[in-house]
Amino acid sequence: TVKAYLAKDALGEYAIPAIRQRPILLMGPPGIGKTQVMEQVARECGVALVAYTITHHTRQSAVGLPFIRQRNYGGKDVSVTEYTMSEIIASIYAKMEATGLSEGILFIDEINCVSETLAPTMLQFLQCKTFGNQAVPAGWVIVAAGNPPEYNKSVRDFDIVTLDRVRRMDIE
């Protein structure tokens, strides 16, 4: 699936446009090697890999920190809240600069164990490929991983709408 998402046509455009690429969801017991599988896939495809265990993150590190900026709307000065770049998105750009690779895999582990405050952000991420107002760069495939509920009591079940937006692969 990663190779298919990264394949380009004769004009150099992605054969499957990013908007049609559903994130891949790997489900399997802890310690089975989901992260190692993604490391191998990245090596074989010749792309970068940025891996995050999302349970170690807060909403602020995922969407960015808020700051106040002065704007003028309709001749009236107002204060508006904007956000810094997401730590996760910034890591993708840092990896691109460090490796010289413009394509890669963003691997988010333990996605179904996120805190209640981060769950809506993860749903937006899976649906829109964004963290806050920043999109995952073109050429980056989203892969998430999780554990079935029988292996982890803090697992949140994905609703049918979310499952419809991912390409689930069970690993045993």
Residue ranges and their predicted role:
Residues 1-172:
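AAA+ P-loop NTPase catalytic core and its hallmark functional loops
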